[in-house]
Amino acid sequence: GLEQYIIDPDREYNKLAKELNASIIKLGASSESYINIFDIREESLEEDQKGYLATKINKLINFFNLIFNSMTEIEKSILEEKIIQVYEEKGITFNDKTLYKNKKFKTTKDMPILEDLYNKLEGNLKTRLKPFVYGSLSYLNKHTNVELNNSIIIADIYELGEENIKFGMYIFIELFWD
């Protein structure tokens, strides 16, 4: 079926969402809707493609470039190494078969979260990630708890504010692209 995705920065689509039985995902400090940036979803690759984890690592490095503004090649290398480790601790490797448990694709509860990565980092990277784990942006440190299989999904980014809107936009664009 046809899927519709709407990014709503001004909460203009709430009434329409109710009329169309759309899912509204509100992202922000007071929200109870969470999207885990570490989720790997089965729909995220075409059938003939392989490499779920490699694809996800590239997307995560892009996301962390937003958080850290700029990273050295050494920082990117450290970050990639630690990302691989947090997935390995969840039993997920570059072998796509590790994403299946009892012949079903692993759920969001089987995926790492930001805190898992934070606990592996040291120094400057760890310090810069702290607000996303324990501070005002800790709503990004949760397992996904929203239904993503609706044909109409509205991403409410009203609460994010000017400084943090880039994180919400990235998360939703990646989610919708998948």
Language-model segment annotations:
Residues 1:
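Glycine-rich phosphate-binding P-loop
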Residues 6:
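Short beta-strand "acidic-cap" motif of Rossmann-like dinucleotide-binding folds
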Residues 9-178:
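P-loop NTPase motor domains
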